Amino acid sequence: MKILALLIAIIGHEIMHGLSAFLFGDRSAKDANRLSLNPIKHLDMMGSVLLPALLLIFQAPFLFGWAKSVPVDMRYIVSQKGSLACVAVSLAGVAYNFTLAVLLAFITHLSFQKLGINALSINELNLYQLALVTFLIQGILYNLVLGVFNSLPIPPLDGSKALGFLALHFKSAFLLEWFSKMERYGFLVVFIFLFIPPLSEFFIHAPTRFLFSLLLS
């Protein structure tokens, strides 16, 4: 159930980038068949298979991953719809993750009430109830982590693209150009923010815990 929850979070994130771009007239994702709900179309060998598998094998406290990036022609969208449309496309994946987290939290509250579940009765659940609870809780958690992480204004994350195009709307291309140059170091940036404890705690884990508690309170 952990893997299923993660795949729904990461694949939906990418599909929403492509879908929002399509709504603004860019057919890149559509023509590449990347708006498909078939998960095979979106799997990245490292981010969708190997990394989650390794985290499971080593019993990591969390799973993390990513799907293949959806092709989007931001130049076309800027020329046809303006830079604010690119801000919307950049944040579409994050919006999906946060919206799904809220929806899953709502379903969790309803399920807990209907099943009479509380912290003391978790061990009394049958296999199917435990699978449902695991899926819901992990789904909330993974979507919050992805939403928080991708909101960071650091290339190549979505937050940097949104900030760059927002600056472009106000006639400044500096941020967009600088972020574009820094994307070559993207893997290193991701590694630093995920695996250096002080940074991951402050920028990812603490905000995620706060939102998680808020949704399930």
Regions found by a protein language model. Give the residues of each.
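Hydrophobic transmembrane alpha-helices and their immediate loop junctions
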Residues: M1-S217
